[in-house]
């Protein structure tokens, strides 16, 4: 089954690579329109998925990732339209020039070909990835989690209907509709057909893909994100940033999971933090110093060492008091996932040092980690947030779904 999907996807990719920007945008507009027109069927499938997931005992954080609402689905359709407005990188000349030999050389952006994406309980990924792949002339094979099986199938049917209406092969966007996990291992060996693989899920999935895949893999999306409250931080805006980074949508990978507090500000800062977190319903996991300083009003539990590596994805926040900037940077290096980290400070020398020494895909000064998102970065919907350094880093927009080829123009030109 998968080999036939690969053959069809590869054939579709050759056709997609030849489309103009206008033709690709018309397809995306049609997909957005169909998502809204077929909203009832998608939401109905999603309700079944959510009910099944709840019966299976999934956490509230996972249920939030899984659930669609009319507003969320409308936002997904709007994201597709936003991709239409983005500049098409395919065909762009990156650089080049006339060589001494007389050969005119240019390096031009081209599609990757076929992209494979393995993801878990995030139904929005189906549309986000499909729209970005189509905009860049790539075909895509999707393998969603069993928790979103019905939602993904309904969504892909809508996308394929739009493709067919625009005269394009339905195989441009395909989903593996069998939830059998053994098919993941088979997909990982489809290097004959898939040019790049992107896993979006937990650490176990990423480890499996890195160890078993014969396809180039881009990993990321696991966010043990930190905020360091420096000794010079302005407390009022710092609290506002922390509340946003923790509570706006706790189930996302750019949510802060560990708060590092400079010891010189701890006694002043921790009590007001506790009050604010109590109002926001956040449970604090405090180290020894925090446990000594705080006695409410926020719910407070002792921090377990293993929790420093946790991606809670819930209203839980580690709070650790550090001696200085060295302690904060050292902690992030040991426990961070190179996703998103921030410093809250009024000392621009410390800000510059933090930015230079924290090796993460996104580093912020006096801002929330929640900005690490393709839409927020002006990239449109994202295919993933890469925490590695090759071939993409941070939110992966359109350019991350392209490669390049060298093209030489001559006039009977030969090498001397």
Swiss-Prot record:
Biological process terms in GO annotation: L-proline biosynthetic process
Record-linked InterPro entries: Ald_DH/histidinol_DH, Ald_DH_C, Ald_DH_N, Aldehyde_DH_dom, G-glutamylP_reductase_CS, Glu-5-SA_DH, GPR_dom
Q: Where in the cell is it found?
A: Cytoplasm
Reaction(s) the record says it catalyses: L-glutamate 5-semialdehyde + phosphate + NADP(+) = L-glutamyl 5-phosphate + NADPH + H(+)
Task: Using the UniProt record, name the top-level EC class of this enzyme in a single word.
Answer: oxidoreductase
Its Enzyme Commission number? Answer: 1.2.1.41
**Is Amino-acid biosynthesis given among the entry's keywords?**
yes
Q: In which pathway does it act?
A: Amino-acid biosynthesis; L-proline biosynthesis; L-glutamate 5-semialdehyde from L-glutamate: step 2/2
Give one GO molecular function term. NADP binding
Q: Which PROSITE patterns match?
A: PROA
Briefly, what is this protein's role? Catalyzes the NADPH-dependent reduction of L-glutamate 5-phosphate into L-glutamate 5-semialdehyde and phosphate. The product spontaneously undergoes cyclization to form 1-pyrroline-5-carboxylate.
Q: Which PANTHER family match?
A: DELTA-1-PYRROLINE-5-CARBOXYLATE SYNTHASE, GLUTAMATE SEMIALDEHYDE DEHYDROGENASE
Q: What is this protein called?
A: Gamma-glutamyl phosphate reductase
Q: What is the gene called?
A: proA
């Amino acid at each position: 089954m998968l080999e036939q999907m690969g053959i069809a996807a590869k054939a579709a990719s050759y056709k997609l690579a030849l489309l103009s920007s206008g033709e690709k945008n018309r397809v995306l507009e049609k997909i957005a329109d169909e998502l809204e027109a077929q909203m009832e069927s998608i939401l109905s499938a999603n309700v079944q998925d959510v009910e099944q997931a709840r019966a299976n005992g999934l956490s509230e954080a996972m249920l939030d990732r899984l659930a669609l609402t009319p507003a969320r689905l409308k936002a997904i359709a709007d994201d597709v339209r936003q991709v239409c407005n983005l500049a098409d990188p395919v065909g762009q000349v990156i650089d080049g020039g006339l060589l001494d030999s007389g050969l005119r050389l240019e390096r031009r952006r081209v599609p990757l070909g076929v992209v494979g994406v393995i993801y878990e309980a995030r139904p929005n990924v189906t549309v986000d990835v499909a729209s970005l792949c189509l905009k860049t002339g790539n075909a895509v094979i999707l393998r969603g989690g069993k928790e979103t099986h019905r939602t993904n199938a309904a969504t892909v049917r809508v996308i394929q209907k739009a493709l067919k209406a625009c005269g394009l092969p339905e195989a441009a966007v395909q989903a593996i509709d069998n939830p059998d996990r053994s098919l993941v291992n088979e997909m990982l060996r489809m290097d004959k057909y898939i040019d790049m693989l992107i896993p979006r899920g937990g650490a176990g999935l990423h480890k499996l893909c890195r160890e078993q895949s014969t396809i180039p893999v881009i990993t990321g999306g696991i966010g043990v994100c930190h905020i360091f409250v420096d000794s010079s931080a302005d407390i009022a805006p710092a609290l506002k940033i922390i509340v946003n980074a923790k509570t706006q949508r706790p189930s996302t990978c750019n949510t802060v999971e560990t708060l590092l507090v400079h010891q010189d500000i701890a006694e002043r800062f921790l009590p007001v933090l506790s009050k604010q977190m109590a109002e926001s319903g956040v449970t604090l996991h405090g180290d020894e110093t925090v446990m000594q300083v705080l006695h409410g009003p926020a719910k407070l539990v002792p921090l377990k060492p293993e929790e420093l590596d946790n991606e809670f994805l819930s209203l839980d926040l580690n709070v650790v008091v550090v001696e200085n900037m060295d302690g904060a940077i050292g902690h992030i290096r040991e426990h961070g996932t190179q996703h998103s980290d921030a410093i809250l400070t009024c000392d621009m020398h410390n800000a510059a040092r933090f930015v230079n020494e924290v090796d993460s895909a996104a580093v912020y000064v006096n801002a929330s980690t929640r900005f690490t998102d393709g839409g927020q970065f002006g990239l449109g919907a994202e295919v993933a947030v890469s925490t590695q350094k090759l071939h993409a880093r941070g939110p992966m927009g359109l350019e991350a779904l392209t490669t390049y080829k060298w093209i030489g123009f001559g006039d009977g030109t030969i090498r001397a």
